[in-house]
Design a protein with these regions (language model features):
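Glycine-rich phosphate-binding/hydrolytic loop that grips phosphoryl groups
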Residues: 114-128, 282-346
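Phosphate/pyrophosphate-binding loops at sites that engage ATP/ADP/AMP, CoA/4′-phosphopantetheine
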Residues: 48-69, 113, 262-274
């Protein structure tokens, strides 16, 4: 049975999956291996190789059955997988600067390799989960985590952009002043913008802006007594799930910000689906429904023809990167007639 592999390289762990020509994932849940990325390219790439051997064994296939490998990493990087010369939070070792991680991995494995940044990989997985690998629909994904990632899928293909920065949705400016209850709020993003989506909808937004703002309105709240805003920010979602009024206000503002953003995307792309993923929605079903309802409440009135656009919650969020990377590799293998990976056979 011939397969493709998906490799999601994070800061501390590598997650793997494999998928066959019937679009069946052969690993359920996480299969992780230590990344050791802070020790530089040579050690990290060896870790990727070693972990892949374990993944194929778990899936019950051979390494020779893998016809292509999809890789995703945090950015910034070019569309072809050349990491930024300035490095990043996850690639602090000087050896990573300007490093061609996709090309080098392909040479080491002796197999073709594709590349996506982690946000685009997650978006491709969300698209596949709804439409399948070969359908030509358009979707917009917003992945709410420490920052705000995501991607744009048009006709089934990831929009990478000229320099690999396509789908940097977190830095789209939104008219946040129209969100009820935010008068006087000054959401500053780490990128230098004021009022982009990430500054209103992310864990960083909760820590830097939303929690301090709402603690001023709820001066006796238990989170204000912790004395550590970083620790307190991580507790907001759990309290919101349990109907804490202040924490629900915080998540309501985040949802309304997403509604404004999605409205812009509807007017720009007229997509078939909107998808939200990440830690904000890795919760119970009741809270997910409430959050989606608040997103819709934040969207201005749509044209009658567009008013029924679905808003989906991305499934299997912890494996989204590896699965999206694998789907990219599967598309590449099919387009280049590698192996026997048509939808009619494995």
């Amino acid at each position: 049975m011939q397969v493709v592999a998906g490799v999601d390289l994070g800061g501390t762990a590598i997650n793997y999956t494999l998928v066959n020509g019937k679009e069946q994932f052969l690993i359920e849940g996480l299969f992780e291996y230590p990344a050791r990325s802070k020790e530089g390219p040579d050690i990290c790439l060896q870790q990727i190789e070693d972990g892949l051997k374990g993944a194929v064994e778990k899936a019950g296939v051979l390494l020779t059955d893998v016809v292509a490998v999809g890789l995703d990493t945090p950015g910034p990087a070019s569309a072809d997988g050349v990491l930024s010369a300035e490095g990043s939070t996850n690639f602090v070792h000087t050896g990573w600067g300007g490093f061609d991680i996709r090309g080098t991995l392909a040479k080491r494995l002796g197999k073709p390799a594709t590349y996506l940044n982690d946000g685009n990989a997650g978006a491709l997985w969300g698209h596949f989960a709804i439409f399948g690998a070969n359908h030509r629909q358009t979707s917009i994904s917003a992945i709410v985590g420490t920052g705000l990632g995501g991607g744009v899928i048009i006709d089934g293909n990831v929009v990478k952009g000229r320099k690999g920065f396509g789908g940097e949705l977190g830095h789209v400016l939104i008219p946040y002043q129209s969100i009820p209850g935010t008068s006087g709020m000054k959401p500053a993003c780490n990128c230098g913008r004021m009022g982009d989506l990430e500054s209103m909808c992310s864990l960083t937004a909760i820590e830097n802006t939303l929690l301090p703002f709402f603690l001023a309105k709820y001066p006796n709240h238990e989170l204000g007594k912790i004395g550590d805003i970083h620790k307190a920010a991580k507790l907001v979602r759990g309290l919101a799930e349990n109907c804490d009024p202040m924490c629900q206000d915080i998540f309501r503002v985040q949802a309304r910000a997403l509604g404004l953003f999605f409205d812009e995307m509807v007017n720009t792309f007229d997509p078939d689906a909107l998808i939200v993923g990440g830690g904000a929605v890795e919760t119970n079903e009741k809270f997910q429904r409430w959050f989606i309802d608040e997103i819709r409440a934040g969207m201005p009135t749509q044209r009658e023809e567009q008013a029924d656009i679905p808003v989906h919650v991305m499934p299997n969020g912890d494996t989204a990167g590896a699965r999206g990377a694998a789907i990219q590799a599967l598309q590449f293998a099919r387009e280049n007639h590698l192996g026997h990976l048509s939808t009619s056979g494995a």
